[in-house]
């Protein structure tokens, strides 16, 4: 059984930003879709997991941007599961222009037994015989972001909409970065030379939830907190 899943693709206009480049939130969605395709091949896709009362949970994601491809540009996508721990899984991603690495990413997952409300051991999930021959596409650790920011400024609000909700009944993973980046003017995003984005998922959100966004900036780093009242639901770091 092959550890790596690869495919050729064209960057779709729906995933591009105001500059005609693959957007930051579009990258998260592209990698999530790629992981979903590979999960089907491995027998751990949504339908197969639902039959076992299991559901994939995204814990955290880091994406490193060396360059971003343009609208309709031909790229090569690759993803693979890393050797799992007892309860946590990591998956790597790469996006290349020919042999040139443009974007690399890594996501930590867990599997929830929806009937029992407990995490499922990795030995009960991944197919037997899968060779874990490839390490991580990202050498840096996931960001460690404080759950509370001292003297942080609230700068935006976002109400979770019906279009944000997925089949699990809560806000889709790809909707969080979309809401996050949409809270900034395009001019400010253009002025930032964003090279790395970390997302740390803390709590599920539901349609109608009012989320407040806070920010705290230091040299080259912008930390963000998304909260529902006092509860932190998402932490993010944009690094230049």
Q: Can you say where each PLM-predicted feature lies in the sequence?
A:
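Hot-dog-fold acyl-thioester-processing enzymes
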Residues: 1-58, 106, 113-195
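A conserved acidic, glycine/proline-rich C-terminal tail/linker
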Residues: 187-216
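HotDog/MaoC-like acyl-thioester-processing domains
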Residues: 2-7, 62-66, 70-148, 201-207, ...
């Amino acid at each position: 059984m092959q550890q790596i899943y690869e495919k050729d693709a064209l960057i779709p206009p729906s995933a591009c930003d105001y500059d005609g480049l693959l957007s930051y939130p579009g990258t998260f969605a592209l990698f999530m879709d790629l992981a979903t395709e590979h999960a089907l091949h491995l027998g751990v896709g949504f339908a197969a997991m639902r039959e076992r009362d299991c559901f994939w949970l995204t814990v955290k994601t880091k994406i490193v941007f060396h360059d971003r491809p343009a609208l309709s540009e031909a790229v090569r996508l690759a993803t693979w599961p890393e050797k799992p721990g007892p309860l946590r899984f990591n998956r790597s991603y790469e996006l290349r222009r020919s042999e040139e690495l443009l974007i690399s990413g890594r996501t930590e997952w867990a599997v929830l037994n929806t009937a029992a409300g407990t995490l499922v051991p990795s030995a009960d999930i991944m197919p037997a015989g899968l060779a874990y021959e490839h390490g991580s596409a990202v050498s840096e650790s996931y960001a460690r972001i404080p759950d509370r920011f001292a003297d942080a400024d609230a700068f935006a609000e976002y109400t979770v909409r019906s279009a944000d909700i997925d089949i699990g009944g809560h806000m889709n993973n790809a909707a969080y970065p979309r809401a996050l980046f949409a809270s900034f003017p395009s001019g400010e995003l253009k002025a930032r030379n964003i090279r790395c984005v970390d997302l740390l998922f803390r709590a599920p959100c539901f349609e109608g939830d009012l989320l407040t966004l806070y920010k705290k900036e230091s040299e080259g780093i912008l930390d963000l907190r998304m909260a529902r009242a006092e509860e932190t639901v998402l932490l993010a770091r944009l690094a230049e």
